[in-house]
Amino acid sequence: MRPEQTARLEELSATLTSIEKVMDPEAVSERVRELEAQAGDPSLWDDPDHAQKVTSELSAQQAKLRKLNSLRGRIEDLPVMSELAEEEGDEASQELVETELKELGAAIESLEVTTMLSGEYDEREAVINIRSGAGGVDAADWAEMLMRMYTRWAEKNGHKVDVYDISYAEEAGIKSATFVVHGEYMYGQLSVEQGAHRLVRISPFDNQGRRQTSFAEVEVLPVVEQTDSIEVPDSEVRVDVYRSSGPGGQSVNTTDSAVRLTHIPTGIVVTCQNEKSQIQNKASAMRVLQAKLLERKRQEERAELDALGAGGNASWGNQMRSYVLHPYQMVKDLRTNYEVGDPSKVLDGDIDGFLESGIRWRMAQQEA
């Protein structure tokens, strides 16, 4: 290997060693064995909520172990790859070594960022709400594109997504959607996505082919656990049931299984229609309502701190990213200035760079 490549590889190896000390692969392996034993117990699914937590954590811990082992293996393999490239003596083989070194560096830096997540709720699963904003049918289409972006990111990273509710727009796209991304540290990673996302493109819905600017709002909440003490008395909740609907307002169910919960004291409304039964829809809607009430409580606490001069700006995420498809192609985070010149990759779920830069930016804001 060239001297600069050797130095870079040693640097990456040292970084990975530091990460391994934090993540503790032996402890992760032990936890995987414990969870596998629980998952193999036939009685596990007697409690579906607990079973979901066990299988989600097992998947996350296995993925964590695979990633650590893969990165360590790639570090060990790179000198061998370089030696073979030198024996080949062609430029293409040397370029492969350089490419692998760059990709390895990016992967290790990405993993390093997750070790920075130490907030009170960072390790939780995430509830994501997407709402179309200004821009008419284009905004509804944009909201659906954002939903696909996040679900594609989750799929690529091995995280299960449960869609709780989708409100379809009349012509195209969605008015709103609520879904949960399962897995450890999903809230910590995805919370930097909260705010207004702006799309600029030639509208496919405009007969004159004019450029259109559309907005959609992304809200990210931590999944509420029993330890959070977010109690919602039945007397404070109005429950309405109705038939699930699909695109164009078509009914997709013959029974009133969809559920709408209205929290009377705050006016917060939550709907869920994608579960199989009214009971399941009510339980899922209640989880989202609790998450919204927890976030409301946190916002009130932040507002009190702001009034005392001890807090930051609670609306930091607004107008946070622009996606420009015309007259040029660029996705840019307006907080971090991180940008990518290939919107198609970003919209297909390649958002790791934005998440990492957002997490680093947030840490810098908290330390300032």
Curated annotation (Swiss-Prot):
The keyword Phosphoprotein does not apply. It comes from the Bacteria. The modification N5-methylglutamine is found at Q250. It is found in: Cytoplasm. GO terms for cellular component: cytoplasm. Residues 36-56 are annotated as: Disordered. GO terms for molecular function: translation release factor activity, codon specific. Keywords: Cytoplasm, Methylation, Protein biosynthesis. Its main location: cytoplasm. Methylated by PrmC. Methylation increases the termination efficiency of RF2. Belongs to the prokaryotic/mitochondrial release factor family. Peptide chain release factor 2 directs the termination of translation in response to the peptide chain termination codons UGA and UAA. HAMAP family: Rel_fac_2. This is Peptide chain release factor 2. It comes from Corynebacterium aurimucosum (strain ATCC 700975 / DSM 44827 / CIP 107346 / CN-1). The gene is prfB.
